[in-house]
């Protein structure tokens, strides 16, 4: 794994990054291919959409299972001339011993799935931009995937 900054992501940032990574792994890579999927991931960059590909865009929100609403920080997140999708992942926080989704395991699984070193480099750089570097503390944040909805 890679190491770096000592600043840790907070729980909301962890949950948000997990949602973006699930979307990358389960949808974007399968639809667009690895390199294009990674290049379209703009979540760590100062843009209004988390993923954008030609005429498609996707804004990813991840919420705890007990919440009934999402926070949209600006109208630009959903405003566009092109029709896009708001994708909402609903996750339930579990104990660290639960066999669920943790940030470190998700990152490692995605990284290991890439064949090209250049794709691995892009992925690692984007993770660094969002503030993620491997830390065992992230293993304490384990989630059960409940559902994903598209709007």
Regions found by a protein language model. Give the residues of each.
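Conserved catalytic cores of phosphodiester-cleaving nucleases, focusing on short active-site segments
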Residues: 27, 51-64
